[in-house]
Amino acid sequence: MGARARGEISRKQLLAAEQAALRDTIALFDCTGSPVITDGEQTKPSFATYPLSGLGNLAADGLTIPFADGNTRQLRRLASGPFHYGVHAVTYLKTAQTYARHPLKQAVISSSALSLLYPRLRRNGR
């Protein structure tokens, strides 16, 4: 995804790489014998912000979420409304199902986490 963002590969090349990673991940999970597997979120740009892909009403100066391991995730800020999903989790599930032989679970970001996109509103001069 970084190579695509830097213009080093085409969208078609990125999609091919994503699909290869997805097929490999699902095949490896299948080998574990687990009755339910996951797609490993291989094709999501971010576990927290995948629903925002393609939206044009976001600004870059949103909340930063720190993690215990020292990593951070910078959320975008909703610059204008209304909010809507750019991509739904079912899109990732349907793609993964084309490769899976076992039931899949799909990670979905909570609506409460997405509420962090909304700018803080000033009340009573604060």
What are these regions (language model features)?
Residues 1-126:
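Domain-level signal for soluble alpha/beta catalytic cores
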